C-alpha cells in the first residue's frame, strides 16, 4: 500500500523511466528488422517485459545487458510459430500491435492477457486486419481475447479509422509491412505517431500528411535506438509541481513528441509556468528538459481535439483541477472507459471519497476547483495511472491518502515512490 501526505512543494532535478510506447515499439520493430538493434533507456516495466517475452516465444534472441537491450532481428519473415499461447499480460499495446505483425505470418498464433486485458475491446483491430486478409477469431466474435490469428497473403488497403487510436493505426501499418500494395490509414484527429517515426528510422517507405499515413513496400534494418523519458510518467510530477506554489522542478531527458505534449498545453492554459530547455532530437523524436515553477492555477476546458495528445494524463489533470480556482470541464474522453479500468468512473468515485466535488459526464467529468481534499483510503482498480494520480492527490490532502493495490504502478513506473520521496519538501 502506497501512502502519500500533504507537502509544501516539489523541488529538484529528476529523470523518469523510458517511454513506454517507444520501448514497446523498439522491441517489436527491431525483431522484424534485419540485423542487430541496440536499445538504450528501455522501460523495464511489466508491460514492456511482456512484449519481450512474446517475441522471445516467436523465436527472437533478446538479451538484457542492463545498460541496453540487444535484439537479433530476423527480418519481416523470420518469426517462428510459437509453441505456447502468447501472454501480453496487462498490455493493450502488446496485444494490439503484435496482432498486426501476426496477421502477416503464415502460421497460427493464440494471444491472450490478464483478466483486465481480456475485457478490453479488440474488434477495433480485428475488423481492419480481417479486411486485409487475416483470419482472426476470439470471444465475442473476435472482440475479446484470447485471439486466434492465422495470417499471410495480406493486401494493403485504404482505411478510415473510426477511432483516433495509435494502437489501431499501428496494428494496420505493421500488417501493411506484409501486404501487397500500399496501406493507407486516415484519422480525423491525429494520434501518437511513434510507430511512423520508428518505421521511417528503420528504413520503411512511409509518409504522413495531414492525418493520412501511407506505407509502401519496405524492409527494416536494425539500428541503435535511444528511448527518451516518458512524458506520461513525468506528467504526475509536472502536474503536482505546477499546482504547488513555490515548487521548482526539472525533469530531464523527456520525450517531447508533439502528439504527446497536450499536458504541457493544458498546464499552461491553467496558468502554469513551464519552460523547455536543452531541446534536441534522437531517432526522429524530440527530447528536452522540462522546467516547472509552481503557482496558482485556474480551471479550464479540455475538449476532444486535444484528448488524443493527453489521454493518459487525464487522471492527474483531474486531481490538480480540484486544487485550481474555478471549474474544469473534460469532454470527448470516451476512450478512458476502455483503458486498464474505466478511468472516468474510477477517478470520479475515488475523488468523491476524498471530498472533491466532481460530476461524471458520459465522455468526461466536471470538477469544482478550490476544494479542501480530506484524505482517506482509495482504490487503484489495478490501474497504474489511477494509483499514481491518487498518490499526487495525497500531496494536497489534509490527511494521508492510502492507495490499495498500488503495486500496479510497476507496470509503467517501477521506482515511482522513491522518485517522489526525493523531490517532496
Swiss-Prot record:
Catalyzes the transfer of the enolpyruvyl moiety of phosphoenolpyruvate (PEP) to the 5-hydroxyl of shikimate-3-phosphate (S3P) to produce enolpyruvyl shikimate-3-phosphate and inorganic phosphate. One of its GO terms (cellular component) is cytoplasm. The keyword tRNA-binding does not apply. It catalyses: 3-phosphoshikimate + phosphoenolpyruvate = 5-O-(1-carboxyvinyl)-3-phosphoshikimate + phosphate. GO terms for biological process: amino acid biosynthetic process; aromatic amino acid family biosynthetic process; chorismate biosynthetic process. Coiled coil: none annotated. The gene is aroA. It comes from Alkaliphilus metalliredigens (strain QYMF). PROSITE patterns: EPSP_SYNTHASE_1, EPSP_SYNTHASE_2. Monomer. It is found in: Cytoplasm. InterPro entries: Enolpyruvate_Tfrase_dom, Enolpyruvate_Tfrase_sf, EPSP_synthase, EPSP_synthase_CS, RNA3'P_cycl/enolpyr_Trfase_a/b. Its EC number is 2.5.1.19. One of its GO terms (molecular function) is 3-phosphoshikimate 1-carboxyvinyltransferase activity. 3-phosphoshikimate binds at residues 20-21, 25, 165, 167, 312, 339. This is 3-phosphoshikimate 1-carboxyvinyltransferase.
Amino acid at each position: 500500500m502506497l501512502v502519500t501526505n500533504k507537502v509544501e512543494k516539489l523541488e529538484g532535478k529528476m529523470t523518469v523511466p523510458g517511454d513506454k510506447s517507444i520501448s514497446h515499439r523498439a522491441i517489436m520493430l527491431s525483431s522484424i528488422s534485419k540485423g542487430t538493434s541496440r536499445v538504450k533507456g528501455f522501460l523495464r516495466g511489466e508491460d514492456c517485459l511482456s512484449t519481450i517475452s512474446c517475441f522471445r516465444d516467436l523465436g527472437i534472441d533478446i538479451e538484457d545487458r542492463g545498460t541496453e537491450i540487444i535484439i537479433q532481428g530476423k527480418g519481416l519473415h523470420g518469426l517462428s510459430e510459437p509453441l505456447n499461447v502468447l501472454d501480453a499480460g496487462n498490455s493493450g499495446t502488446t496485444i494490439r500491435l503484435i496482432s498486426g505483425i501476426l496477421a502477416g505470418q503464415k502460421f497460427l498464433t493464440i494471444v491472450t492477457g490478464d483478466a483486465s486485458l481480456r475485457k478490453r475491446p479488440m474488434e477495433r483491430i480485428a475488423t481492419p486486419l480481417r479486411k486485409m486478409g487475416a483470419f482472426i477469431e476470439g470471444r465475442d466474435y473476435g472482440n475479446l481475447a484470447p485471439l486466434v490469428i492465422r495470417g499471410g497473403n495480406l493486401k494493403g488497403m485504404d482505411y478510415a479509422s473510426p477511432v483516433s487510436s495509435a494502437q489501431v493505426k499501428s496494428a494496420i501499418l505493421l500488417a501493411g509491412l506484409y501486404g501487397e500494395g500500399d496501406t493507407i490509414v486516415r484519422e480525423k484527429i491525429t494520434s501518437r505517431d511513434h510507430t511512423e517515426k520508428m518505421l521511417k528510422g528503420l528504413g520503411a517507405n512511409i509518409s504522413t500528411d495531414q492525418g493520412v499515413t501511407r506505407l509502401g513496400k519496405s524492409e527494416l534494418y536494425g539500428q541503435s535506438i535511444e528511448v527518451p523519458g516518458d512524458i506520461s510518467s513525468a506528467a504526475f510530477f509536472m502536474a503536482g509541481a505546477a499546482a504547488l506554489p513555490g515548487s521548482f522542478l526539472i525533469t530531464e531527458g523527456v520525450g517531447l513528441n508533439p502528439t504527446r505534449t497536450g499536458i504541457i498545453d493544458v498546464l499552461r492554459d491553467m496558468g502554469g509556468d513551464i519552460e523547455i530547455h536543452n531541446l534536441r532530437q534522437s531517432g526522429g523524436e524530440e527530447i528536452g528538459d522540462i522546467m516547472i515553477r509552481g503557482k496558482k492555477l485556474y480551471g479550464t476546458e479540455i475538449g476532444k481535439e486535444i484528448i488524443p495528445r493527453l489521454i493518459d494524463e487525464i487522471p492527474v489533470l483531474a486531481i490538480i483541477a480540484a486544487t485550481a480556482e474555478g471549474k474544469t470541464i473534460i469532454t470527448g474522453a470516451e476512450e478512458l472507459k476502455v483503458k486498464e479500468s474505466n478511468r472516468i468512473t474510477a477517478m470520479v468515485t475515488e475523488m468523491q471519497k476524498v471530498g472533491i466535488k466532481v460530476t461524471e459526464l458520459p465522455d468526461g467529468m466536471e470538477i469544482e476547483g478550490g476544494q479542501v481534499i480530506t484524505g482517506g483510503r482509495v482504490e487503484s482498480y489495478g490501474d497504474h495511472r489511477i494509483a499514481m494520480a491518487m498518490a499526487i492527490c495525497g500531496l494536497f490532502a489534509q490527511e494521508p491518502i492510502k492507495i490499495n493495490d498500488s503495486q500496479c504502478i510497476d507496470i509503467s513506473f517501477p521506482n515511482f515512490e522513491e522518485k517522489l520521496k526525493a523531490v517532496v519538501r
